[in-house]
Curated annotation (Swiss-Prot):
Domain of life per record: Eukaryota
EC supergroup of this enzyme: lyase
GO terms of biological process kind: photorespiration; reductive pentose-phosphate cycle
Official protein name in the record: Ribulose bisphosphate carboxylase large chain
Designated gene of the protein: rbcL
Organismal lineage: Eukaryota, Viridiplantae, Streptophyta, Embryophyta, Tracheophyta
């Protein structure tokens, strides 16, 4: 008879429910450089202590379940469990608190944003002991960052490809977003590009509909790009939306774009999914395509102040998954966006090292080491009179993406693009001369109007 091997599972196992805080609340824990750290805004059900709710979040997003199980003894919970290590109140909100949770790195698959989110937010948000839960921020350790390719190219490589320096880039979303034939769509692209824009863009829901199939759109847009390049002597691009119903179809569209010789494609990274986005990002790196990212569906996730995820988390995830541009809000346009908070996640997209700064919503210091940066795209509801503020707020490494602010010009698309370009160059020139864009912006634009055709 073979000898019996004694395990923890066979010694003193006690079935039953016990409080989460007995195992998962560890205020004495000192976080490791390799831990993924999360800041959750917790709104518990009445009568539940913060320590128990914070521990519940840590448990249900890592190794825990609602009861003690025999197989807990077959592993090392101390090694693999998430830990709620700190709790702090939310100023002005009596019923809310911030729970800080540390996750051991071994809980996550390397190079997979999909797995990271499945673990951290995949299940716990439906926990009935919580009235609401919001993931405010994540600290991604260097050890995990280094398992990701990140953006296909990054800011400096994009500027080198386009041969454009010292100013923000200009873009325009073609409108109406749905209903144009491919040929008329291409004409609209051409008019904008020849007028002075650097890019035009497919709207997020332009994929391959009966009125305009993707292949026809790609062909007519490529014609517009080459014609406008020949006329202006500048490199131009159109964000060809490769988003599709399957990853295979998405890659087929990206392959066709590469064969046409265009510089950039586009993906809706939230509706398309992180696995699809990372797949496309790797293809773009390997084949020299820039990748523009649209955040369609983000407000479903990030708009509520007490439930969901803040966009800074989605921005960090995009930098890991891969994209050269991403829409980031405008501060001055028609969509929501507080200046300091917006600039906080803009820095998280562009910079290599970002210090903790709670006034800007940054809960953790983030070191991206060698991961390339992402260009923020300011879009929605902006026009030439916003140009001084946009230039001051976003700086040179940005894309200012117009729509009606170009196409709504009474003389048409090309004059609208000229107006955008003249306004931008006037603001950049004034800034470089030391003028105050915030105080003198209106005067700068009026001066530019005198000489604009």
């Amino acid at each position: 008879m073979s000898p019996q091997t004694e395990t923890k599972a066979g010694v003193g196992f006690k079935a039953g429910v016990k409080e989460y805080k007995l195992t998962y609340y560890t205020p004495e824990y000192e976080t490791k450089d390799t831990d993924i750290l999360a800041a959750f805004r917790v709104t518990p059900q009445p009568g539940v202590p913060p320590e128990e709710r914070g521990a519940a979040v840590a448990a249900e997003s890592s190794t825990g379940t609602w009861t003690t199980v025999w197989t807990d003894g077959l592993t090392s919970l101390d090694r693999y469990k998430g830990r709620c290590y700190h709790i702090e109140p939310v100023p002005g909100e009596e019923e809310q608190f911030i729970a800080y949770v540390a996750y051991p790195l071994d809980l996550f698959e390397e190079g997979s944003v999909t797995n990271m989110f499945t673990s951290i937010v995949g299940n716990v948000f439906g926990f009935k002991a919580l009235r609401a839960l919001r993931l405010e921020d994540l600290r991604i350790p260097v050890a995990y960052v280094k398992t990701f390719q990140g953006p296909p190219h990054g800011i400096q490589v994009e500027r080198d490809k386009l041969n454009k320096y010292g100013r923000p880039l200009l873009g325009c979303t073609i409108k109406p977003k749905l209903g144009l034939s491919a040929k008329n769509y291409g004409r609209a692209v051409y008019e904008c590009l020849r007028g002075g824009l650097d890019f035009t863009k497919d709207d997020e829901n332009v994929n391959s509909q009966p009125f305009m199939r993707w292949r026809d759109r790609f062909l007519f847009c490529a014609e517009a790009i080459y014609k406008s390049q020949a006329e202006t002597g500048e490199i131009k691009g159109h964000y060809l939306n490769a988003t599709a119903g399957t990853c295979e179809e998405m890659i087929k569209r990206a392959v066709f774009a590469r064969e046409l010789g265009v510089p950039i494609v586009m993906h809706d990274y939230l509706t398309g999914g992180f696995t699809a986005n990372t797949t496309l990002s790797h293809y773009c790196r390997d084949n020299g395509l820039l990748l523009h990212i649209h955040r369609a569906m983000h407000a479903v996730i990030d708009r509520q102040k007490n439930h969901g995820m803040h966009f800074r988390v989605l921005a960090k995830a995009l930098r890991m998954s891969g994209g050269d541009h991403i829409h980031s809000g405008t501060v001055v346009g028609k969509l929501e966006g507080e200046r300091d908070i917006t600039l906080g996640f803009v820095d998280l997209l562009r910079d290599d090292y970002i210090e903790k700064d709670r006034s800007r919503g940054i809960y953790f210091t983030q070191d991206w080491v060698s991961l390339p940066g992402v260009i923020p795209v300011a879009s929605r509801g902006i026009h030439v009179w916003h140009m001084p503020a946009l230039t001051e707020i976003f700086g040179d490494d940005s894309v200012l993406q117009f729509g009606g602010g170009t196409l709504g010009h009474p003389w048409g698309n090309a004059p609208g693009a000229v107006a955008n370009r003249v306004a931008l160059e006037a603001c950049v020139k004034a800034r470089n001369e030391g003028r105050d864009l915030a105080a003198e912006g209106g005067e700068i634009i009026r001066e530019a109007c005198k000489w604009s055709p």
